[in-house]
Amino acid sequence: MFLDDVLRLTRSGPAKASMSANKWLTLWREKKEMLAETPAKMNAVSSLASTFRDADRTLLFTQSILSANTLASSLTDMGISASAHHSDLSTDERDVIMSSFAAGSTTVLASVQTLEEGVDVPDADLAVIVASSKQRRQMIQRMGRVMRRKADGRDARFIILFVKNTDEDPRLGAHELFVEELLAVARESSIFETSQASEVRAFLDPRRL
């Protein structure tokens, strides 16, 4: 995988190649954070507040700690019980947050790569990919957090936010296999602009089906 090769060069490549790899990695991380923290995505998440209130539990997946903290804080200000879950928190702090999510006291969890394989996550019926991972395995794990069969027969709902004409745009081939697997099990799917918040909320309303 290309990213693995870059990381290998930063650790053990020739001096010139290692320098170039480190420069590329810095720019890549900056771009990843910019896509995660773009105000348009923050506004898109805020516009779904009523959908989060109606959901049992919601998982927000992003790629920067600032994004997770901003999302949790913004939703909390809107009266939604939301928490961020990331590596800057201690293990004890993350355990308390997860227990609150399991009990239903916290209904929205914004995560940065801390809910991946090996972490027991309570059942959720809504997930939002605010910023996507380039690792297909990680994306499939995220899908699995929500796509488990619900005891009461409810449909799981899955949202992917993306900036058009960037390398996270599924229409340009981003996460092609992951999106194909998602669509293969979807009852319905659609693409909306951020200006269509009311249409998105109506589409996600479980009472519509």
Each language-model region and where it sits:
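A short beta-strand element within the Helicase C-terminal
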Residues: 108-111, 116-133, 138-141, 155-161
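Long, largely alpha-helical accessory region at the distal end of helicase-like NTP-driven motors
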Residues: 170, 174-177, 184-209
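Short beta-strand/turn micro-motifs composed of small residues
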Residues: 10-11, 62, 86, 131, ...
